[in-house]
């Protein structure tokens, strides 16, 4: 957080190179610092919407004690973008996904070592970027709404 008299607003920090970034919350530092996230293994991903806005779907009762999430239009776009990951990343197999009103869970298998310089962060970053872009197109076609590229439909921070 910015010090008294600092130009940095609360909730924002300067990184080691002087760039402004959102302050990480305690639950956002779950990556292992020296771990190779390009290696062959199964990864469980959770991505939370900024401000936990419940815009991906709604809980509906299917039967006695049986509930499900019915995706909204935006939730459907996010699911479609997730399921297209393998088009750009043939080294990846999608195992499972679960949409919740304000967050998303996915399990993926990196079947083979990713190309040099690429990691799980690149895969998830491209998914979030594409989702935000596609949701932005959807909102623009409907005559407005917040531009997700500016306000961020998907959280700016990856939670792993």
Residue ranges and their predicted role:
Residues 1-160:
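Short catalytic/metal-binding and nucleic-acid-binding patches
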